[in-house]
């Protein structure tokens, strides 16, 4: 019987795709990795709902922080990561837990701005300025650290996972209704998570 591999979602900006693909290749034999541009978002669908579904069906998330944007804070310009990648990290932390999310970013001496809420999370850093421009080799140490973390993976209990997903959906959807009455009407028209 083949060992079940963990499912990993890899997020990045368009500019960070080369690093995302390199990580996917480096983890090929350790996990089933899907980069965000590989059929994650269905045509005519709601991006946020696709991301929630992907998070619920992932065991881990890897978030490639490439510093593509600039931000001005108190008259100082700094490089910063694309905001949607930070949002996706937060979404995944909320659904699969902080221990199952990895930040991968280039080592840099430049003025880099990260949201203060991420202070204390240790990112995996790589040398993006290698003389030979070998991105896979640069990302190798980060990928090896992720592989070591994956050794503790055990497939989740499917029934428990499904029940938890349903509860998360019910809780999350309740925030979108303006009144308890609206939510009650919605709940009356959908299958109960308690049945």
What are these regions (language model features)?
Residues 53-57, 61-149:
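Cross-kingdom TIR/SEFIR domain
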Residues 1-61, 95, 178-195:
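Conserved N-terminal substructure of TIR/SEFIR domains
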Residues 29-31, 44, 48, 72, ...:
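Short, surface-exposed, charged/polar-biased interaction segments
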Residues 25, 107-108, 161:
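Residue-level detector of alpha-helical recognition elements and their boundaries
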Residues 112-193:
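C-terminal interaction surface of TIR/SEFIR-family domains
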């Amino acid at each position: 019987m083949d060992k079940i591999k963990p499912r990993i979602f890899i997020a990045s900006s368009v500019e960070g795709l080369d690093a995302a693909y390199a990580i996917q290749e480096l983890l090929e034999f350790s996990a089933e990795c899907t980069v965000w541009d590989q059929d994650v978002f269905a045509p005519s669908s709601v991006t946020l709902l696709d991301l929630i579904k992907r998070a619920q069906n992932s065991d881990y998330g890897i978030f490639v922080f490439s510093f593509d944007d600039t931000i001005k804070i108190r008259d100082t310009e700094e490089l910063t990561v694309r905001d949607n990648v930070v949002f996706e990290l937060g979404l995944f932390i909320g659904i699969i837990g902080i221990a199952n999310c990895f930040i991968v970013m280039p080592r840099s001496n430049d003025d880099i701005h990260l949201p203060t809420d991420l202070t204390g999370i240790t990112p995996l850093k790589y040398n993006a300025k290698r003389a030979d421009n070998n991105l896979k080799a640069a990302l190798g140490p980060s990928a090896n650290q992720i592989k070591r973390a994956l050794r503790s993976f055990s497939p989740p209990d499917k029934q428990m996972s499904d029940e938890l997903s349903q509860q998360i959906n019910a809780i999350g959807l309740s925030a979108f209704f303006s009144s308890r009455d609206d939510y009650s009407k919605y709940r009356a028209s959908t299958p109960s998570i308690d049945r």
